[in-house]
Curated annotation (Swiss-Prot):
Enzyme class name: oxidoreductase
UniProt-annotated binding residues for substrate: 88, 94, 126, 157
One Gene Ontology term from the biological process aspect of the record: tricarboxylic acid cycle
This protein's record includes keyword Oxidoreductase: yes
Catalyzed reactions: (S)-malate + NAD(+) = oxaloacetate + NADH + H(+)
Annotated GO MF terms: L-lactate dehydrogenase activity; L-malate dehydrogenase (NAD+) activity
Positions that bind NAD(+): 10-15, 34, 101, 124-126
Enzyme Commission (EC) number: 1.1.1.37
Sequence similarity: Belongs to the LDH/MDH superfamily.
Encoding gene per record: mdh
Keywords: NAD, Oxidoreductase, Tricarboxylic acid cycle
Organism lineage string: Archaea, Methanobacteriati, Thermoplasmatota, Thermoplasmata, Thermoplasmatales
Task performed by this protein: Catalyzes the reversible oxidation of malate to oxaloacetate.
Designated name of the protein: Malate dehydrogenase
Length: 325
């Protein structure tokens, strides 16, 4: 059986951590790309040299894209993970990264389109829902093959905080977060439970509100501690879960930024944009989008999230119009 091929573009903390987790889970050969000379080669070699202890017989190889022809090495990738971009610094919101990152995504997109347009693509560069939209616009790739990190990580944080508060195994906590991957995310209390028991039966409203707030600013909390960068271990494993569901055709249901169109657009009140919703992930990418019903207070939060995504997506359209040759 031919081994799968996974390309990771961006060998910073997130990209390198993803590369290590993908290898550790033996999901396929990992090709790591970065514009900084030596970084992808060095990190890939370091991951490769741990193979005897991790017990993976896979190739982990790095390529510096300061020579753009090196992108040719991602040809025929089953999955491409795009983490290239600037990391957040204290005081920055995910949206502050917009201008720099859309430029980086434009370069990456050109090379994906040229060398590996049939891959399933996971977009991580912040703001991920907006960068997924930009990548789709730049490449023209079928949007069902593109998904953005967001809810997968936010839900993981939400589940962690709930499990710690209740002193139960994280495995028994089911919870999810939808909407934009930003301060407008919508943690869904009603659909959150411990072994099927609604969390509203287990925690006071005040305590739940506190956990929701911490989830919403979970990324910022880590940025404030680290000072020079943002989270990478939890994002790394959240991305790995998405890739694993594609490679193994697991059909996992995970909230991610997906392209909303057709009847889903009527339901969610947003059309032809990427926003975080529960999706089924399999070998074809986004295989199903689930429509969930909102109560009035949830709908209010959702609409706020939609407005924020619409405004940022419009900035992408303006950027493209300005830079069209």
């Amino acid at each position: 059986m031919a081994r799968k091929k996974i390309s990771v573009i961006g060998a910073g903390n997130v990209g390198a951590t993803v590369a290590q987790f993908l290898a550790a889970k033996q999901l396929g050969d990992v090709y790591l790309f970065d514009v900084v000379d030596g970084i992808p080669e060095g990190k890939a070699l370091d991951i490769q040299e741990g193979a005897p202890h991790w017990r993976y017989d896979l190739d982990v190889v790095g390529f510096s894209t300061s020579d753009e022809t090196k992108y040719k090495n991602m040809e025929g990738s089953d999955v491409i993970v795009v983490t290239a971009g600037l990391a957040r610094k204290p005081g920055m919101s995910r949206d502050d990264l917009f201008d720099k990152n859309v430029e980086i995504i434009s370069d990456v997109s050109r090379n994906i389109k040229k060398y590996s347009p049939d891959s399933i693509i996971v977009v991580v560069s912040n703001p991920a829902d907006i960068m997924a939209y930009a990548l789709q616009k730049f490449t023209g790739i079928d949007p069902s093959k593109i998904m953005g990190l967001g809810g997968s990580l936010d839900s993981s944080r939400f589940r962690t905080f709930l499990a710690k508060e209740l002193n139960v195994s994280v495995e028994d906590v089911n919870a999810f977060v939808i909407g934009g991957h930003g301060d407008d995310m919508v943690p869904f209390i009603r659909y959150s439970s411990v072994a099927g028991i609604p969390i509203e039966n287990l925690l006071s409203k005040e305590k739940i509100d506190e956990i929701v707030k911490r989830t919403r600013f979970g990324g910022g909390e880590i940025v404030n501690y680290l000072k020079t960068g943002s989270a990478f271990y939890a994002p790394g494993i959240s991305i790995t879960a998405m890739v694993e569901s594609v490679i193994m055709d697991k059909k996992r249901v995970i909230p991610c930024a997906a392209y909303i169109t057709g009847k889903h657009a009527d339901h969610y009140g947003i059309r032809d944009k990427f926003i975080g919703v529960p999706i089924k992930i399999g070998e074809k990418g986004v295989e199903q989008i689930y429509d969930i019903d909102f109560k009035p207070d949830e709908l209010e939060l959702w609409k706020k999230s939609v407005a924020s995504v619409e405004a940022s997506s419009k900035k992408v359209d303006e950027w493209i119009a300005k830079h069209a040759h």
